[in-house]
Amino acid sequence: MRLPNSRVLELPEQREVRGRAFPLVLGPDGSFDPAACRDAILGLARDHGGILFRGFDVPTPEAFATFVETLRIENMPYVGGAAVRTPIVGDRVFTANESPPGEPVPFHHEMAQVPEPPAYIFFYGDRPSVSGGETPIVLSHEVYSCFLEEFPGCCEAVEAHGIQ
């Protein structure tokens, strides 16, 4: 599957997971209409586990909110998380991390504590960081598969207690 008016880019941090680039990195190649590409965007996100859109015309948090809304994905309120989140645009765009700049950012497991976590999570960088600024992402189901393979007894014990 290919996304119209985009080109595939590469990053040194990318990994191959089950034969696919993670995350898939796309740059613009002509005019881009996310609403017209909705099915392709969501399909590529499912196939690759994540898409990094690099260089597209999304200059403000409001433009980012519009981009997300054009994909017609159910909005899930941020409930029960330990991190501080400040609303930026309505109930769709929030700060992701309000830790001091020197603190490392752990992997995001957004709303892992709820029975039905969101199928899609979107991140937006409003201002480039002077240094650092990375947001690490991981495919939780791949981590679980590797952990299950390496430590099956531990996984069985945890699952027996009803912990997910």
Q: What is the meaning of each model-derived region?
A:
Residues 1-164:
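Non-heme Fe(II) oxygenase catalytic core, chiefly the N-lobe of the double-stranded beta-helix
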